[in-house]
Amino acid sequence: AGGESEIHYAPRPEHLNSFDVTHGGACMTLLDVVMATAARSVNQDMGVVTIEMKTSFMRPAKVTPGGRLTAKGRLMHRTKSMAFTEGTIYDEAGLACAHATGTFKYVNRAPDRATEAGIVHPQISTD
């Protein structure tokens, strides 16, 4: 809420690369989601689509078994139709592993056809 978001992520074995650290693609997906969540936190009636994203990897995103990474997103600026964000992934020691900036376009949300059909979505925890 208020232009900020936080997501905790426990990488599964299939999300690790050959060096046994979280794959860069998994990190980029996490950053995309945490930045989009920050952008949407100021207007949950609108959806967002990614226009541009730049990622810098600073250190391996390694976790101990059962451990998790923490991603934090922040809305830096917005206009009526665009959101400018940043996000950082931290390891268990609180060290920054990856940082991204992203630009998102606000769009009208599509109707949730699954809900209309009575299908229940699993809840995603972002604690």
Predicted regions located by residue number:
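Hydrophobic beta-strand-centered segment that forms part of the acyl-chain substrate-binding groove
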Residues: A38-T70
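HotDog/MaoC-like acyl-thioester-processing domains
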Residues: K62-P65, T70-D127
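Active-site helix/loop of acyl-thioester processing domains in fatty-acid/polyketide metabolism
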Residues: G25-D45
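Catalytic strand-loop segment that frames the active site of acyl-thioester-processing enzymes
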Residues: A1-T22
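Residues at secondary-structure transition points
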Residues: N17-T29, V48, T64
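Well-ordered beta-strand positions in beta-sheet-rich domains
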Residues: H8, E52, H99-T103
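Hydrophobic residues in beta-strands and at strand termini
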Residues: Y9-P11, F57, Y106
